[in-house]
Amino acid sequence: MAKIAIIATDGFEEAELIYPYYRLKEAGHKSVVISLGKRPIEGKFGYIIKPTFKIDDVSAKDYDGVIVPGGTKNPDYLRRNKDVLDFVHTIDQQNKLVGAICHAGWVLISSKVIRKRKATSYYAIKDDMINAGANFEDSSVVVDGNLIFKNFFRILCQTYSFNC
């Protein structure tokens, strides 16, 4: 049973958080929502979620992977938080699963984990990914070792299996 952190804050894309959260649970894994604080967070379309933990109360060593959902505001806020960046960077350094959906590539850019690695993203941040040194592929899904990128939430159902 894997323990996967889903890191999000206000402005998350609901489908990109809710689908992996429940799909992991259905497969027998433990999924938790980690945020910048303990207050409820509001998604892009108004869905409210109460985080399980706040980022400064967790350690990457206790998790088997991390997923960062997109939306435009969510990753923009997350990439400004040192604890989030350290968490994602440490998970990557431990060769554990790092999933980024849509605009979440911004968090991986700021975590310094995509240079010289294959990646994809929502088309609007393609230049950001390339300028950060990613080997960008215009594809729905890109896997490079422990990194899994999805360019848009609509393809989640097709490929987020996490070896379940």
Task: Please annotate each region the language model reported.
Residues 119:
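Anionic-ligand binding patches
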Residues 1-94, 98, 107-113, 126-138, ...:
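Extended, subdomain-level signal for the structured scaffold at the beginning of enzyme domains
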Residues 101-103:
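Short, thiol/selenol-centered motifs that function as redox-active sites or metal-ligating centers
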